[in-house]
Amino acid sequence: MGNSLLRENRRQQNTQEMPWNVRMQSPKQRTSRCWDHHIAEGCFCLPWKKILIFEKRQDSQNENERMSSTPIQDNVDQTYSEELCYTLINHRVLCTRPSGNSAEEYYENVPCKAERPRESLGGTETEYSLLHMPSTDPRHARSPEDEYELLMPHRISSHFLQQPRPLMAPSETQFSHL
C-alpha cells in the first residue's frame, strides 16, 4: 500500500510539472502553443514554443507488476543526446496576420553547422536556441510532438514588440535549462 501511494505521488508531481495540461490536448495543440498559452492559429504572441515532453510510458501490465512488488526500482538509465540549432524570428513579419493556418511558417531554421546565423536586419530579429533531444532507447518511436523546444533568452520583456533590441552576443544570452 505504501509503495502504491509513493508511486501515485510521483505521478502527480510529474503531471503538475507539465505546462498547460498537455495530457488533455491533441498533438497539434501540444506543439502549437505560445508563451502566453494561446493556440497558434489565434495568437500573435512571441515567441512560439514547441513543448518537449520526456515521459516514460509503460504498459499497464508492467505497471501493475511493479506496484505489487515490495521494492520500488525506478529505471533512470535513459540517456539523451543534444543537438544545438538556431532559429531567427523576424518580428516585423510576425506582427502582421499570417496568411496560412499557422504562424510557424515564419521560422527560419539555420543548420547547426553554420558558425553564425545570417546577419540581423537592423535589430528586428532575435536569436533563439532549439534543443533536440531524441531518446537513445531503440524501443522509443520518434514522433513529431517530442522533437524541439524553443528556449527564450532570459532578458526578453513583454513589451519587446514595441521596443526592438539589438541582437545579443551568444555569451550575453542566458537560456533556461531542461
Curated annotation (Swiss-Prot):
One of its GO terms (molecular function) is myosin II binding. InterPro entries: GC_assoc_lym (IPR031364). Expressed in diffuse large B-cell lymphoma (DLBCL) and several germinal center (GC)-like lymphoma cell lines (at protein level). Highly expressed in normal GC lymphocytes and GC-derived malignancies. Expressed in thymus and spleen. Changing residue 91 to A: Loss of FBXO10-mediated ubiquitination and degradation. It is found in: Cytoplasm; Cell membrane. The modification Phosphotyrosine is found at residue 148. Phosphorylation on tyrosine residues can be induced by IL6. Phosphorylation is mediated by LYN. Targeted by the ubiquitin E3 ligase subunit FBXO10 to mediate its ubiquitination and degradation. The keyword Phosphoprotein applies. One of its GO terms (biological process) is negative regulation of lymphocyte migration. Induction: Up-regulated by IL4/interleukin-4. Its main location: cytoplasm. Keywords: Cell membrane, Cytoplasm, Membrane, Phosphoprotein, Ubl conjugation. Involved in the negative regulation of lymphocyte motility. It mediates the migration-inhibitory effects of IL6. Serves as a positive regulator of the RhoA signaling pathway. Enhancement of RhoA activation results in inhibition of lymphocyte and lymphoma cell motility by activation of its downstream effector ROCK. Is a regulator of B-cell receptor signaling, that acts through SYK kinase activation. Interacts with ACTB and MYH2; the interaction with MYH2 is increased by IL6-induced phosphorylation. Interacts (via C-terminus) with ARHGEF11 (via DH domain). Interacts with ARHGEF12. Interacts with SYK; the interaction increases after B-cell receptor stimulation, resulting in enhanced SYK autophosphorylation and activity. This is Germinal center-associated signaling and motility protein. The gene is GCSAM.
